Amino acid sequence: MKDTIVAQATPIGRGGVGILRISGPLAQEVAKEVLGKELKPRLANYLPFKDQDGTVLDQGIALFFKAPNSFTGEDVLELQGHGGQVILDILLKRILTIKGIRIARAGEFSEQAFLNDKLDLAQAEAIADLIDATSEQAARSALKSLQGEFSNKINQLVDSVIYLRTYVEAAIDFPDEEIDFLADGKIEGHLNDIIRQLNGVRKEAKQGAILREGMKVVIAGRPNAGKSSLLNALAGREAAIVTNIAGTTRDVLREHIHIDGMPLHIIDTAGLREASDEVEKIGIQRAWDEIEQADHVLLMIDSTEQTAEAFKTEWADFLAKLPQNIPVTVIRNKVDLSGEAEGLQELDGFTLIRLSAQTKVGVDLLREHLKKSMGYQSSTEGGFLARRRHLQALETAAEHLERGHIQLTQFFAGELLAEELRMVQNALSEITGQFTSDDLLGNIFSSFCIGK
């Protein structure tokens, strides 16, 4: 017989209500032993919870959900009693005296829901993300993922890939006409539509991953431009040593902050210049390592040393070396000394913010700009939440689509195109759990709460 599992569904500690959840074929047996009666599905019962000798341990609401009409898809019993931890522990101990009942693993209720097709893997992950959300925007986005918005987009992509794959494989079955099929433009048109569709989902997923995991913001610039002062201003504390000596920061400094609940990882780096000191050279190389992995770069410029219009010329080598997909915000610091007014403007394709890290004038403008860059919205609108593994799967799918496009347009190789489309389908299906290893499932659900 399949295991019946039990766990506390409410947080450990003192509260108004405490809930124990039981799922599995023995759920009704628990009701008979602890409550003294079988329960009708979906009907709330106010009953005493009894020990083996009939002693009343607590009293409260009991709810029974008959399979498959429950969260896990199994028979489920919920006992809602008083929220004292001692009471809940006594009741849990009582339930575990019943043969065939064991404590649930972390995330096992959600895992059973996934295995019983009550929700897919992306939706299951969204449960944990909703619980862990640190902002209203992240919570709303996690809820959209739980309701299937992300999964629906993936399923639409998979359906499009299957349709095209079927069309291509049908052409392969008629070798005399295969070239005509592959060259008539219809397959390439469908393939281009899938590529555009996938790129749109990738863009949304990247924004969703930033909402969940935080945006990595690297502060870069020349020595003494005020990078460490800006880190301190954003952190709201003296996280970095600040002096007038150029090159004070020689290693990477990291600070984790929240802006209206939105997580950011702020990284202060060594000043970029030609250095003769070996230690400083190492610091500069580490700075570049961080820059190349950034989600956003803040380029600090001393407003007392050059005009705003000159930055593209002065920083041409830096901009050329920077990966093209990383957004850059130019920060003109020390406006308290240069006499410039605080403000934000668009200049030559870059956002430029004038501020003083020392006096904190204009720092709020930067905070609002970073929130916007992360996808913050004060309304109820917004996208779904995503994880890094989702981004990796989407990236893998995009790579196979690109290879498939080459096989089609350059070689008219139907069999190789069909194989690339199969790989695309597998990569996308990993997101929803249609093709997923047991090891991956274990890693995902082990990060959940006990009782979920």
From Swiss-Prot:
InterPro entries: G_TrmE, GTP-bd, GTP-bd_TrmE_N, GTPase_MnmE, MnmE_dom2, MnmE_helical, P-loop_NTPase, Small_GTP-bd. Residues 214-375 form the TrmE-type G domain. (6S)-5-formyl-5,6,7,8-tetrahydrofolate binds at residues 21, 78, 118, 452. This is tRNA modification GTPase MnmE. Its EC number is 3.6.-.-. Belongs to the TRAFAC class TrmE-Era-EngA-EngB-Septin-like GTPase superfamily. TrmE GTPase family. It is found in: Cytoplasm. NCBIfam families: mnmE_trmE_thdF, PRK05291.1-3, small_GTP. PROSITE patterns: G_TRME (PS51709). The keyword Heme does not apply. One of its GO terms (molecular function) is GTPase activity. GO terms for biological process: tRNA methylation; tRNA wobble uridine modification. K(+) binds at residues 224, 243, 245, 248. The keyword Zinc does not apply. Keywords: Cytoplasm, GTP-binding, Hydrolase, Magnesium, Metal-binding, Nucleotide-binding, Potassium, tRNA processing. It comes from Actinobacillus pleuropneumoniae serotype 3 (strain JL03). Mg(2+) binds at residues 228, 249. Pfam families: MMR_HSR1 (PF01926), MnmE_helical (PF12631), TrmE_N (PF10396). Homodimer. Heterotetramer of two MnmE and two MnmG subunits. GTP binds at residues 224-229, 243-249, 268-271. Its cofactor is K(+). Binds 1 potassium ion per subunit.
